[in-house]
């Protein structure tokens, strides 16, 4: 690098060919003008130009291009009031000046102010003093004695210009080498003759070599350069092309940490932007769209002034899967409501879902959307797990807009109550939770299986604390674009309220030191045992942490000593680790939360060792003398109502009291207690700490009206709050019934309570997400104050680390270079060619939306039954069973189900044989007659049907077969013949007697019924009717034996009236035994035995088996 490179400076303009290297004498116009005015007013000799001047203008001589364009050109009237005697001498520091630009008079700037920026960003030019050069001869300065003031001024001006030209030429020859050869001697003469404007224009035309500028002077991309005026571009046009090859293309300005620098203020888009749906080749959506409404999208103006960042983010959210990261209180709900309104207009029957982690957040979003978007209340519902599944199923069929928790949504989707194909928009609040297996991720995955055409809008204030966590959110929700704003962003700066953060650090009190000393003596023996076994390396018991002990246990179990140890040693080490991990939580309570929570934990630990409970090492600690002494000290302290067990708690009490007293809380003129509009929220990590804070603050009621605010799950010594109780506490807090809320992590996210003026963080969190969420509870509607109470040491370091981590993550997310977005899975949904335009108008809020209660479905005395589970199938799914071979093969080659079609025979030509081939030959004719036409013997031959009475014994049993088994018809035939042989000889006479008696009576008047063989009675018999007995016939008798025995042997026939018989049979008409007995003509005709088909089909007529009726017997006796 040449010497001239050392004198170069950095600039943020990418057009490096528009600058030349010259002396400060050309750029410091203030020095020349001061010299001219001094020679005109005071008649002094022009100062001699010296090359080794010291105390130069230095960095003050650098004039920013933007500031030079904004300041007006000076005239002679501005010379008045300037102290020309104190003008400093110039130096040889090099500066960059444009070659082609409209000339403006140089202005002397005393000092340039740098805008506030992070330390890793490059802030302005870097100056380096050139190496000393040997002195060169300078032209002697001419001294002129003016005759008059006007003539002397003109002469002095010419002499000064000539001296400047000579000095410039010598300086160019000295530092620029061959470059000065391009300037001939005549140019200096012409420069002295032309006026000042022409001289300066010529100086701008001096050629310039890019190699004279150091490589690191410009490191910015072309897109990061500030906008240039048209006049400047026109002047640079003819000269720009000759240096275009040396321009740094594709570069991006980066910070000292290797991150991409944030764009300059000039390149940040300001004002309202116009975005259009992306041009994608995708299948048409299955949602029914309203073509008339697609031409516009509505931006509500109900809230007053239009905010540019809300307008731009809303457009992006309509056309892309968007992650919106805005500081709390900047209108994320307004953006969500506007996007929901437009998708509600664009679709006819599709459903829109807003999900939030808790019911208080869900109810808060409902009230905001009702007042902003104007979506009808009749089409909106809020569903939680408390509603019955049957009621939720009815709501899913009738409504279009749903506000619910993600757990309820995934349950309804899995059970088939909700149809995933109808969902067109999913709005996710507190989207930083969408990592791992949280319900947000499961919902998006489930919907994607059935629906490829739905929009996702994710809202959060803190996307994540690490690059991996932010990428997990992007992957879990299929995010395609990110819109992030920080409190330093230009377009939101005017809407951010001031937040004054006060960090207070504390040291351990004397009581805490005493407790730590006694507790260390108690735990020291167990810690020493672990150290002797090389299972733990720490010596100080007060440095124990649950996480550190867990990691130490895992490392020891994986080491050679842990793997090779016997079971007794392993059990001992695990028992010691378990006891110390339980007591390590007590150490954290003592250090950061107070003595009272610490004492409660020890009492619970001691109660687990009563009697035979607890292990060896637990009893060892409880029986230790130091532990007993510690408990004796703590018991009277905690029973004292005035005791405050931590310095942070004492400071917290003073801060809260001072805040309310300054706000005029409770100072009424008439002696009544007035309620101010100010509110305070206190955040604590554990419930024990929250309850202790409430106990201390309640001493000052009614000035301080505190209440605890915890989650739903119950813990030891503390009951949880259901969602209904949480809502009531928030409402009372807004109304003023409570003016102080002491909340755990449940109050960190999403609660929109604009009147909170003071946030007190009782403990610090290493997570930047939780820290920013806590701070975001204040400063929403007016300026707020934040007080952080930290203990010196670990807690203070955690806060600093979380703050730095948050700032770095915001820079990474804004740069967009470290994350992979899913633009391919973000559907367009809208038809191609549709480009909605913005329509700003006042939204008419329906009267039904002004109701105060939430749109929850009403409970019913008898809720509807849960509908059967419905299986929603994705598009193009293969239903039915599939062969295993088709699962691994090509699915495209799978055989499709074809309808069986009957093939029609097609005529085929048959070769007609010759007549000689068809007719029998004489020999064949003789063989036919001999074998088949003539029978030997003299007896006549007859062709008869097969006889069933021939060979009865052989026909009644199956004969042996070899290759072919007997068929079903043969088996039935054999069974029929066996039954026929079982019929006795008196069968014919018995049937004749029965039919003769039956024909003597009219069939419609009476029916012959055997007394001993009546059918089984119905269940509904009258009381006192006994069940008739039934005789079991032997196996060898015929099927007609019971009838023969009952009728023939007893000879008792009882006619029964049909009405009485119907009552006994349950109004059932008797069924004839044979089908031939149905007609009246058959009864009156001569008796014929049943034919063969009737006997065979006897069993087939009984289509349904008889049911065995049970008799209900009753006793009327008084006994």
UniProtKB/Swiss-Prot annotation:
It catalyses: ATP + H2O = ADP + phosphate + H(+). Residues 112-153, 176-246, 823-905, 1002-1042 are annotated as: Disordered. It comes from the Eukaryota. InterPro entries: FANCM/Mph1-like_ID, FANCM_DEXDc, Helicase/UvrB_N, Helicase_ATP-bd, Helicase_C-like, P-loop_NTPase. Transmembrane segments: none annotated. Its EC number is 3.6.4.12. A motif (DEAH box) lies at residues 429-432. One of its GO terms (molecular function) is four-way junction DNA binding. ATP-dependent DNA helicase involved in DNA damage repair by homologous recombination and in genome maintenance. Capable of unwinding D-loops. Plays a role in limiting crossover recombinants during mitotic DNA double-strand break (DSB) repair. Component of a FANCM-MHF complex which promotes gene conversion at blocked replication forks, probably by reversal of the stalled fork. This is ATP-dependent DNA helicase mph1.
